[in-house]
Amino acid sequence: VRHTASELSELARLLKNLDGETRVVMESTGNYHAPVAWLLHGAGFYVSVVNAMLVHDYGNNSLRRGKTDKKDAVKLANYGLDHWLTLPRYVPEEDTRLMLKTCYRQYQQYSKVQTMLKNNLISLLDTAFPDANRLFTSPPRADGSEKWVDFVATFWHCECVCGLSKKAFTAKYQKWCRKHGYNFSQDKALDIYASACGRFGVMPKTNTAKLLVEQAISQLQTTSAALAALKQEMQSLAASLPEYPVVMEMFGVGPTLGPQLIAEIGDVRRFH
């Protein structure tokens, strides 16, 4: 059965023609089961979506453990019969909760990508501007930007700093701070200058090297901006849910962890 409206509707019609009470049991397999469960639930069936591990460990008492779609279907049916009275009923999630959970899944994926891209940029800078990522300790901004990343977008090679006089770099750094909205410090400018002049890049200062660093920075900045946007959207979605104040009052829960807890656990008010 393909996941089209016509074929799933035909499946619902065939199930309705069966004698006796019919319950539909399916494994929770990513998002693959979602359209089937949603349509059959809407058609009035008792639908139960069970954890795949519960079914996998059920009835493994055969010496031969072949795995085919037919055998899996029989195994699911037997599991459903044995747990008929305790099968959890599938209830479609509210739109807000569904979108919050989806946003969090995407947030997790982008976080992994961001870590990979950040490590890649640091590795490149180790050959062009060693320890450039250690020049600043400022936390990321709300839009996802980080000071050290913005800095190396302009001063991508240590020669971009030590190739200037101390006075010229200080003036250029002050102009850069003003452009990007960072606070300027004369002492910090001198520290950066001393650090850059105490390093050397094994990668030559060429257009190719600049291209490599700029592309790595561009990808990282794009991913960081996407993460910041997702974080803001998760905060907005979570704040519209009734359990939000309860979660946010928990010890150690902040604006980042709170929406994540709600996305994973759901309405915590059901626990007593």
Where do the model's predicted regions map?
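A detector of single, family-specific signature residues
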Residues: V1-H272
